[in-house]
Amino acid sequence: MTHQTHAYHMVNPSPWPLTGALSALLMTSGLIMWFHFNSTTLLMLGLTTNMLTMYQWWRDVVRESTFQGHHTPNVQKGLRYGMILFIISEVLFFTGFFWAFYHSSLAPTPELGGCWPPTGIHPLNPLEVPLLNTSVLLASGVSITWAHHSLMEGNRNHMLQALFITIALGVYFTLLQASEYYEAPFTISDGVYGSTFFVATGFHGLHVIIGSTFLIVCFFRQLKFHFTSSHHFGFEAAAWYWHFVDVVWLFLYVSIYWWGS
């Protein structure tokens, strides 16, 4: 790899995809163990493995891009295509949850009382915490765009300020969502309403946590002067992902919270 005469990055063998897959297996198995047997051992093991994998994989990517110069324009182009395909796959992932929701709500079965929300379910008021959550995420979309424009103009301080605001709003959203779950008058086991509500909003919440982590990494990288106005794909990918999370929430809010209530 040291003496390459082409613009492409031949990646060195890495253990992180394997440990990442192992952590995913441990986390999903751990969730089942937690739900059914109230044991969090596997889940904690999975989360720890996942955190270690993320740290070391990100460290390697930063080393390759910033310090070894492997991310040439051709490589960045490939990474952009990869990120676009990843976001498309995420769109299809959430399509499944919306499909389940509309399949259940547009033609409620007699078991549900022939109505939606099902008999006995008291839905959350869409004009309370969900509306606040919507405004928080929309504001974070504005601040991430401000950060991007500041980076393009070479204004480092404004970029850091805007990025910090975005991260703070992302954390605030997560805390609001957690409090809403804690106070919700129904649970994930309350029939198809509880299942579709908690799975769809829960996976969105997980994506907000992933996006916030991505932005925190970008924040620390910017503190170390890793980004320039012409070389910042790591931040660009995080911004694309954050906008995707924003748009998914708008669909969730309109479908599940507002129309579905």
Swiss-Prot record:
Residues 1-15, 67-72, 153-155, 224-232 are mitochondrial matrix. The keyword Calcium does not apply. SUPFAM superfamilies: Cytochrome c oxidase subunit III-like. It comes from the Eukaryota. GO terms for biological process: mitochondrial electron transport, cytochrome c to oxygen; respiratory chain complex IV assembly. CDD domains: Cyt_c_Oxidase_III (cd01665). Pfam families: COX3. Its EC number is 7.1.1.9. The chain crosses the membrane at residues 16-34, 41-66, 73-105, 129-152, 156-183, 191-223, 233-256. Its main location: mitochondrion. Keywords: Membrane, Mitochondrion, Mitochondrion inner membrane, Translocase, Transmembrane, Transmembrane helix. GO terms for cellular component: mitochondrial inner membrane; respiratory chain complex IV. GO terms for molecular function: cytochrome-c oxidase activity. It is a multi-pass membrane protein. It catalyses: 4 Fe(II)-[cytochrome c] + O2 + 8 H(+)(in) = 4 Fe(III)-[cytochrome c] + 2 H2O + 4 H(+)(out). The keyword Translocase applies. InterPro entries: Cyt_c/ubiquinol_Oxase_su3, Cyt_c_oxase_su3_dom, Cyt_c_oxidase-like_su3, Cyt_c_oxidase_su3-like_sf, Cyt_c_oxidase_su3_a-hlx. Component of the cytochrome c oxidase (complex IV, CIV), a multisubunit enzyme composed of 14 subunits. The complex is composed of a catalytic core of 3 subunits MT-CO1, MT-CO2 and MT-CO3, encoded in the mitochondrial DNA, and 11 supernumerary subunits COX4I, COX5A, COX5B, COX6A, COX6B, COX6C, COX7A, COX7B, COX7C, COX8 and NDUFA4, which are encoded in the nuclear genome. Belongs to the cytochrome c oxidase subunit 3 family. Component of the cytochrome c oxidase, the last enzyme in the mitochondrial electron transport chain which drives oxidative phosphorylation. The respiratory chain contains 3 multisubunit complexes succinate dehydrogenase (complex II, CII), ubiquinol-cytochrome c oxidoreductase (cytochrome b-c1 complex, complex III, CIII) and cytochrome c oxidase (complex IV, CIV), that cooperate to transfer electrons derived from NADH and succinate to molecular oxygen, creating an electrochemical gradient over the inner membrane that drives transmembrane transport and the ATP synthase. This is Cytochrome c oxidase subunit 3.
